[in-house]
């Protein structure tokens, strides 16, 4: 039987790049990798209301640069920047190096796969019907510019005795086209009947040429200039 590969891993260095961007040798590699995992876990668990999509970590020289992509940056920054300074101090203690924080606003959370998956998971926890949650997410994504979207939910859907997988798709989602800009994410909904897994694929158009940093750069430019990035 065929198996679906991870769309992000398949497109690394084509139109996607890594979320951890640094180089290390020997035991330093394991130490930095563990630090990255701790940083991401701490940020996501302590800022659940910020709607965080991803955390990008770069380590030039002795500096640790952390970029947080979130739909609600105000929750991270806090009143007069007090909360972000506390976060920076905590991360500096965890890593033992100088930390620079950069907050990037996600202007269209409806077409961000991680936020869509987490939104569906939150609705399932609140006992919203899974078909209604999936259809609502699909319609919102298409309305805001996605060319195609597919959502799958797997588990004891609706409290059924036997677990199954249900999916809903609209538009094009060309997983075999490497130049396709496919945004993919997973989430879990911990319900009274057990864990339900959610997977989301969003097709945002094709990226011609070899530019792994294209999407990240457009989002950073939009943050500083106030102009929304093109699909």
Swiss-Prot record:
CDD domains per UniProt = KH-II_30S_S3
User: Which GO molecular-function terms appear in the entry?
Assistant: mRNA binding; rRNA binding; structural constituent of ribosome
Provide one Gene Ontology biological process annotation.
translation
Keyword field contains rRNA-binding = yes
Q: Which InterPro entries match?
A: KH_dom, KH_dom-like_a/b, KH_dom_type_2, KH_sf_prok-type, Ribosomal_S3_C_sf, Ribosomal_uS3_bac-typ, Ribosomal_uS3_C, Ribosomal_uS3_CS
GO CC, one annotated term: cytosolic small ribosomal subunit
List the SUPFAM superfamilies. Prokaryotic type KH domain (KH-domain type II), Ribosomal protein S3 C-terminal domain
Q: Which positions fall inside the KH type-2 domain?
A: 39-107
On whether Nucleotidyltransferase is a keyword of this UniProt record, the answer is no
Q: Which UniProt keyword terms apply here?
A: Ribonucleoprotein, Ribosomal protein, RNA-binding, rRNA-binding
Family from the record: Belongs to the universal ribosomal protein uS3 family.
Subunit field text: Part of the 30S ribosomal subunit. Forms a tight complex with proteins S10 and S14.
* Entry-linked NCBIfam families: rpsC_bact (TIGR01009)
What function does this protein fulfil?
Binds the lower part of the 30S subunit head. Binds mRNA in the 70S ribosome, positioning it for translation.
**Name assigned to this protein:** Small ribosomal subunit protein uS3
* Source organism per UniProt: Novosphingobium aromaticivorans (strain ATCC 700278 / DSM 12444 / CCUG 56034 / CIP 105152 / NBRC 16084 / F199)
